[in-house]
């Protein structure tokens, strides 16, 4: 079994060429039931989170401002860390082996970049964001939230499990500051239409028009920075983008 290792230990299951962990040692089912009773440790309130355990170099005046919900294997999270070195980004992932991989990947990147300070601004939490998001973030804390290629839950009976729904949108609005942005990307048109419908119906969001969405410097990175996005590109699949502003 692969476990997370401290930064000063040698990583197992690591490529001799890249020095990074290899995904084949961290395989897991593509999706996890978010309604099931997983065993999670979670804080009672945001003030109880020990962020320094995840970000050893974080300054007293810094806090998490970007959240990649369902970050998968961390490709986009790493890109965020590179694009915004002064911002603190967190990836949240429910699957244990996948979150272990992201943690080990970040540890390896920090070791390879030792002395530069790179990748000290990203981290990953294994948690269920559909249940515990307000336990980690105070009201209006986040600037940006990302929902990239979420589980479409195709069966109608499972639509209630979708990461975008009316109840959860109110929770996202609570932790998102006014003017903050929600980025969504999927290769499933039905899910895209579901997202747009629910976001449009919620009084605390407005959709960015096409021009504003396409001029956002993050937009080009949404297509293939994540492993799932890169797979869609390889398979010549469709991408459906929608970005919303918190009112």
Swiss-Prot record:
GO terms for cellular component: nucleus; tRNA methyltransferase complex. It is an enzyme of class 2 (transferase). Keywords: Methyltransferase, Nucleus, RNA-binding, S-adenosyl-L-methionine, Transferase, tRNA processing, tRNA-binding. Gene3D superfamilies: Vaccinia Virus protein VP39. It is found in: Nucleus. GO terms for molecular function: tRNA (guanine(46)-N7)-methyltransferase activity; tRNA binding. It comes from the Eukaryota. Its main location: nucleus. The keyword Cell membrane does not apply. Its EC number is 2.1.1.33. The active site is at residue 151. S-adenosyl-L-methionine binds at residues 70, 93-94, 128-129, 148, 226-228. Pathway: tRNA modification; N(7)-methylguanine-tRNA biosynthesis. It holds the Pfam family Methyltransf_4. It catalyses: guanosine(46) in tRNA + S-adenosyl-L-methionine = N(7)-methylguanosine(46) in tRNA + S-adenosyl-L-homocysteine. Belongs to the class I-like SAM-binding methyltransferase superfamily. TrmB family. PANTHER family: 3-DEOXY-D-MANNO-OCTULOSONIC-ACID TRANSFERASE/TRNA GUANINE-N 7 - -METHYLTRANSFERASE, TRNA (GUANINE-N(7)-)-METHYLTRANSFERASE. Catalyzes the formation of N(7)-methylguanine at position 46 (m7G46) in tRNA. This is tRNA (guanine-N(7)-)-methyltransferase.
């Amino acid at each position: 079994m692969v476990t997370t290792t401290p930064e000063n230990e040698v990583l197992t299951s690591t490529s001799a060429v890249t020095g990074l962990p290899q995904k084949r040692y961290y395989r897991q089912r593509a999706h996890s039931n978010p309604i099931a009773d997983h065993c999670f440790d979670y804080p009672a309130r945001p003030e109880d989170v020990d962020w320094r355990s995840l970000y050893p170099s974080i300054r007293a005046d810094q806090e998490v401002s970007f959240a990649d919900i369902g970050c998968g294997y961390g490709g986009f999270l790493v890109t965020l860390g590179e694009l915004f070195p002064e911002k603190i980004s967190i990836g949240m992932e429910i699957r244990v082996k996948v979150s272990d991989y992201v943690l080990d990947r970040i540890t390896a990147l920090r070791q390879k970049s030792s002395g530069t300070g790179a990748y000290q601004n990203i981290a990953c939490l294994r948690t269920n964001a559909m249940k515990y998001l307000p336990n980690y973030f105070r009201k209006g804390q986040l600037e940006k939230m990302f929902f990239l290629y979420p589980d479409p839950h195709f069966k109608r009976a499972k639509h209630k499990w979708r990461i975008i729904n009316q109840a959860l949108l109110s929770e996202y609005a609570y932790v998102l500051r006014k003017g903050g942005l929600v980025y969504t990307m999927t290769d499933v048109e039905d899910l895209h239409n579901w997202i747009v419908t629910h976001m449009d119906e919620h009084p605390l969001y407005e959709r960015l028009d096409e021009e504003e969405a396409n001029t956002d410097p993050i937009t080009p990175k949404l297509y293939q920075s994540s492993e799932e996005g890169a797979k869609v590109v390889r398979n010549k699949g469709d991408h459906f983008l929608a970005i919303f502003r918190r009112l």
